[in-house]
Amino acid sequence: MRCLTLPWPLDLGKAVKDHVDLPGSNLVYDFHGDPLSAELFIVMEGNQFMVIPDVLEAFFRHLGRRAEVFYVTLPPPRFRPLIEGHPLAIGNLVLKFRPQVVMGPPDFMSKIKDLVTEPKTFVRNKGVVLLVQKGNPKGIKGPEDLIREEIKIAISNPKTEVNSFKTYLAALEHVPGLKEKIEKEAIFSQVIHHREVPAFVFEGLADVAPLYFHFAYYYQNPRFFETPLFDYLEFPEGAAQQGEYQVALMKGAEEEELPRAWQAFLLTNEARELYISHGFAG
């Protein structure tokens, strides 16, 4: 499959003068910061990547100083090797570090319960919407239109991104025959759905994709994109699929200052309001 990408804005990298970015080669979006100087290592469910820079700045103010933070925004199964002490490769770059904080959905956190402290819920999302091409050229009005033969659907991979796939499918399976169409005909992401699936729609390989509301909000936010990339459709069954985001410390990190401070800050109203400002439910 050819390389697909969107004009993703940088966060921590934009403050550095010298770049070797090359789309399709030396371009990395889901690993943030400097792992060599980091004081705090965090792995997190990737679909919250847009809010983290704001949360970090607020955290530094709360802490009373800046800290070097390295964080990973991937589907939880993709960063699990790091939690279990295994290396993770991005092309020829090999990373092996010990996360101190894990942020993920309840289902995933329950699978690593022997490795982390008791997870705490710090925010919820607003459920699922339908992402469509700008102008909605196929005239999609809601989930019922997805059963139309000519409509191509993109969705996260049911094997590698189990949690998001289950959530998206649950929002759509009330339409007779749609579950079967998705299982047989959908275009599935291969590695990271929060990067791949929007690109499928943007490039016209798919007409529609179920995605979390805060993604749709992000793509229309002029702070990140001067021109909105997509349109989106809300529907009741999607709004009902709100998901929780939890945070836990890796065992052995309970007495370390920064991991404890980060977890405590995520549970504050200030952090919650920042998530809400990016399209989360709070």
Identify the residue ranges that each predicted region occupies.
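A short beta-strand-loop structural module common to alpha/beta enzyme folds
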Residues: 43, 65-81
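Pocket-flanking alpha-helical
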Residues: 77-116, 217-222
